[in-house]
A protein has these predicted regions:
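Ligand-binding loop in jelly-roll beta-barrel domains
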Residues: 81-107
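Glycine- and acidic-residue-biased ligand/ion/polar-headgroup-sensing regions
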Residues: 48-50, 54-60, 65
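Short histidine-centered beta-strand/loop micro-motifs
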Residues: 20-21, 41-46, 88-90, 109-110
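Short acidic-glycine-tyrosine-enriched beta hairpin
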Residues: 66-82
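Histidine-centered metal-chelating micro-motifs
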Residues: 39-40, 61, 77, 81-87
Length: 118
């Protein structure tokens, strides 16, 4: 059995979830593409997971608890589990975001304390 797993995804797909493709056990990662003017069709919260959004391309907005946060390529945004959120693309631009979910408060170590040089 290998100690890694690689996959290739269609970067133009509307949504790709990597948990099954990579056998993830500690986080959920998805790639999300919205065309210009489109939005996620629901507002949501999480029971336990915080989310980190990285804007890979384009621009748009994240509505968090009623406040619109402008997003542009290169921006990163962390959202608490209980915050109501909805992503939408700008009227004149598509948006591609990487979303990482992990249980809030579960990070026990960081790169410098968890990594071991071998």
């Amino acid at each position: 059995m290998s100690n890694f797993k690689k996959t290739t995804v269609d970067m133009s797909a509307s949504r790709t979830e990597l948990h099954d493709l990579l056998d993830l056990t500690g986080s959920e990662v998805s790639i999300n593409n919205l065309p210009a003017g489109a939005k996620v069709p629901f507002v949501h919260i999480h029971k336990k997971n915080e989310e980190v959004y990285g804007v890979l391309a384009g621009k748009g907005f994240m509505n968090i608890d009623g406040e619109d946060i402008a997003l542009n390529a290169g921006d990163w945004l962390r959202v608490d589990p209980s915050a109501k959120r909805q992503l939408r693309a700008a009227e004149d631009s598509a948006i591609t975001v990487l979303c990482i979910q992990a249980q809030a408060g579960s990070l026990a170590d960081y790169s410098l304390t968890d990594g071991v040089i071998v």
